[in-house]
Regions:
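Aromatic-rich, lipid-facing transmembrane alpha helices and their immediate juxtamembrane interface loops
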Residues: 1-160
């Protein structure tokens, strides 16, 4: 349930972040107040951090590895997400063509660095606070969110 709860909490937070920064544009493809790419990215960061924690290295190297692995992995996920949304829904929700160091339309080195920094902020500042809340979410709430998400995704795909 831990990862499901993180997925939903960060997808919802991601939706509001997108709405705040891009208030003139719809921040996603789903009806609900969630932007799944943030939830997926969070799960990936948590798994990368779990993998790095297996190694007996000092904290500085852990932070560097987290930054590098998250930057690369999340840039790839962002690019795949952009192409999938374009292919499935014929929508372009973001376009980094104007970035100096873009790698195609859907990712750039600038954004990759932001994702790397965000992963450090998530693991070392947000996660310690959020873990206390995440672990207390009742299973029934998680199951309800899963059902609502599947319903939302199904309706969205049917109406594409």
């Amino acid at each position: 349930m831990y990862y499901f709860n993180y997925f939903f909490v960060m997808s919802i937070i991601g939706h509001f972040i997108e709405s705040f920064f891009y208030s003139s544009k719809d921040s996603g493809i789903l009806m609900g107040y969630w932007t799944p790419i943030y939830g997926i990215g969070t799960i990936i960061i948590l798994l990368i951090n779990k993998y790095i924690d297996k190694f007996k290295i000092n904290k500085i190297f852990k932070i560097i590895f987290l930054f590098v692995l998250s930057s690369i992995t999340l840039a790839i996920i962002e690019a795949i997400g952009g192409y999938l949304i374009k292919w499935i829904f014929n929508l372009e929700l973001w376009d980094y063509s104007n970035h100096k160091f873009n790698i195609g339309k859907y990712t750039s080195i600038e954004m990759s660095l932001i994702w790397g920094l965000s992963s450090i902020i998530l693991i070392y500042f947000i996660k310690p606070l959020l873990d206390k809340i995440i672990k207390k979410i009742p299973k029934v709430i998680t199951y309800i969110l899963i059902i609502l998400f599947i319903f939302d995704l199904s309706i969205t795909l049917i109406n594409k």
